[in-house]
């Protein structure tokens, strides 16, 4: 892609949130409305089908000049020609992924606390997804990091930080005020009847930060 990483509004796909809507059409609506980064996430998908979707999403995202990342699966990200991968704490270590993918491949890492954030930065992550910032239905067993925890991470590391989990257009401003450069969003965009309006609400909040 050859462009600077922009994590302002980071869309993560989850087909369960689509409520019957078409994945590609919905992602395109979000791209048209101004999301700045897309992550293809499918926790229990089959490799071949995931690769096909990743290739299609990469093509779609690149039409709008937006990078595509793949959640967890470095192999699929590389084979699909995606721009990067996002790795959780139980996935392939960031340092090992960097060895395989090279210096120009985007690698994001999940961090739940300062220690994990420092390690991910040291190991070569380009950005951090930090949370859960707020309580959320999809992460019932997770103790929220909270805005203060997010602020502490933002003050500690030098790479961009994205707030994850429970972020809505209404609390997005508070996430930015804590020092995050953006937010990763699933249901607050994909689960809405008007995807473009949902994206616009986030961007309006960003413009008033």
Q: What do the PLM-derived regions correspond to, one by one?
A:
Residues 146-150:
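Short alpha-helical segments enriched in small residues
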Residues 181-182, 187:
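C-terminal structural segments of small proteins and small subunits
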Residues 1-92, 99-126, 142, 152, ...:
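Conserved N-terminal beta1-alpha1 strand-loop-helix module at the mouth
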